[in-house]
Design a protein with these regions (language model features):
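Generic low-complexity, intrinsically disordered sequence content enriched
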Residues: 11-15, 48, 73
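Periplasmic/extracellular, small/polar-rich flexible segments of pilin-like filament-forming proteins
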Residues: 52-134
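Generic N-terminal initiation segments characterized by hydrophobic and/or small/turn-forming residues
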Residues: 4-8, 41, 63-66, 107
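N-terminal single-pass transmembrane signal-anchor helix
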Residues: 1-32
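Conserved hydrophobic/amphipathic alpha-helical signal-anchor segments
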Residues: 22, 30-69
Length: 134
């Protein structure tokens, strides 16, 4: 009696593993990029809360600089791994742009509206914002 696997059995296992990898790898990259985007989403949420406090205390105007806000958000690009430093100088909005993304993702921008809290995504490679759920 022979012990071991036949060539057909080994090829079947290799095919099944290949099919699973083909399905799983794109999902992995999407989930990984979504996790990277959470860096910006968290910072933008903190800025929005600070801007709403500033708005209530300063005659219905928003701050135009991070230094004017009562938050501990780093102001320099080097302080962030995946995004550039936030821009709060936009009327009623703050934004952060992805840096050093590959060609398949592109450098997209996430923008939060202070009034509604909605986060919008623009730019990047075709379909990036849709794949990330924005």
């Amino acid at each position: 009696m022979r012990k071991g696997f036949t060539l057909l059995e080994l090829l079947t296992v290799v095919m099944i593993i290949s099919i699973l990898a083909i399905i799983a790898i794109p999902q992995f990259f999407r989930v990984a990029e979504r996790a990277r985007a959470s860096e910006a989403v968290n910072v933008l949420g903190i800025i929005r809360s600070a801007q709403l406090r500033y708005y209530a205390e300063h005659s219905a105007t928003y701050a135009t600089s991070l230094a004017d806000l009562d938050v501990d958000v780093p102001p320099n690009n080097d302080d962030y791994k995946y995004f550039n430093a936030p821009n709060v100088g936009i009327a009623g909005q703050a934004s952060m742009t992805r840096k050093n993304a590959g060609a398949s993702i592109g450098n997209y921008t996430l923008t939060i509206n202070y009034d509604t809290g909605d986060i919008n995504c623009t730019g990047g490679a075709a379909g990036t914002c849709r794949r990330l759920g924005f």
